[in-house]
Amino acid sequence: MSTQNNQSIRSSCDRCRSHKLKCTVAPENSRSGSNRCTRCIRAQVTCVFGHRSQSKRSTNVKKADIKSGTNSQETTSMQASTIVPGRVSVSPDLWVGRQEVEEGLPIGSDGGPSMGDGDLWAELGTNHDLNVFDLTPSSLPTYNSQQQFSATDFCSAPMVPHSDLSAINSQEWQFDVSEHPDQTTTAPHVIVQLSALVTNIHETSKSLGESFWASLAESSQLKNYPIGRVLSLSQDFTAILECIWMSKTMDYKQSSSFVTSESDGQDGISSFELEDVLDYGELLSTVGTSPGRSDFSTSTHSSVATAVDMPTMLLVLSCYTSLTKLYSLVFEHFESHLSHLPHSYTSPTSHTSPRWGLGLQLGELPSADETCTKVYTAVQILLDAFQSVEDVVGLPRSLSAVRQQTCGKEEEAESGDVFNRASLWTDFLAKSVFKATVKGTSEEDCEEIRQLSIKVKSLKALIRERMKL
């Protein structure tokens, strides 16, 4: 009997295998070549040693190897399109579990040759970190066509704890806020800012008008007057207006590059018309001004004014009017307090006649009352802030409460002139808005601004009188 046949003959006879008994061949029978076990000899039955059946696992592997040659390209494309590129860690239990289901036998049983976990991964030639694109169809374990292991099952398989899959795209897909400035939080719209400013101005005016500041009995109480709130409102208003001018000027410069320039004969005439901003026929008829008239000296001014929408313009005028009322209230409180102070209290050394000579020093001069000095300083600070507001607003000189005091008669007569800076509106538009806020009938177009100007003049005169200037 050849070596190949001996390897295929079972070591136990059929009778012993059926009874699950140990089959032992007597030495003398082995030498004689009968190959009969001792149990069959005692039972006096024929002892038959059958051949081993071919291993089912080896048959499946051979069939899969033949089939994998034809489907290698398809399998590789499916894995490449499904699995994320990179180093993927795959547990060896993945192949072990599939092998147990296919064969129905435990790994390492006596039914045939088996391959352990270490042998499997040694054959693949990798460690636990397995590169998916290094796998070839011949190196991957394959099975029959009914239960072929697909790429979807591979992606859903459990990974080892030290998997690098989560680290592949952790930095690639991080959102950098600095690279997307448009996504950051922006400042509120200018209309929202102006609306909030109007509310703050009205609340401040109400709190000061209903407080005890209008009737002060002692000069020490004036030290707690909240001029910082009024000053802060003026500064906020100026900052908002500067932002409006900056944004609208930039928008005009960008749009002007796409617009053809007008003829040289029309450079001094603005193309701005009120109908572009206002569509109210009653306002035009009330004002009685031609729509084609413009108070802007250049076309740039008119273009920038056109870019500002009507709600913004009206809110700016509302803020300016409310701020004017607030200033009038504050100056009225100052004047009321100073008018009730005795003359002797302001300058106790005014009636004395000191000897002034060559040795007179600055510190020896009589000083004015401390209250008058502080009120004078407060008035100057508030007027400077209000003048900044008027400059940024760009109102005509005839509507300015502070500029009128520094202008000559010739400049005051030029009611249609505007400052060198561009204006948000035309002269007659501003006057019409202010005129609508006047209570009763008056010949003046802007009664509130006129009253503020008168209040400033009288307060300054009273301060000079009290300080003996």
Curated annotation (Swiss-Prot):
Record region (Disordered): 58-84
Binding region for DNA: 13-47
Record's subcellular location: Nucleus
Keywords from the named record: DNA-binding, Metal-binding, Nucleus, Transcription, Transcription regulation, Zinc
Compositional bias segments (type: Polar residues): 68-82
Top-level lineage group: Eukaryota
Gene Ontology CC, one term: nucleus
GO MF assignments: DNA binding; DNA-binding transcription factor activity, RNA polymerase II-specific; zinc ion binding
Summary of the function given for this chain in its UniProt record: Transcription factor that regulates the expression of the gene cluster that mediates the biosynthesis of Equisetin.
PANTHER family per record: GLUCOSE TRANSPORT TRANSCRIPTION REGULATOR RGT1-RELATED-RELATED
Protein name: Equisetin cluster transcription factor eqxR
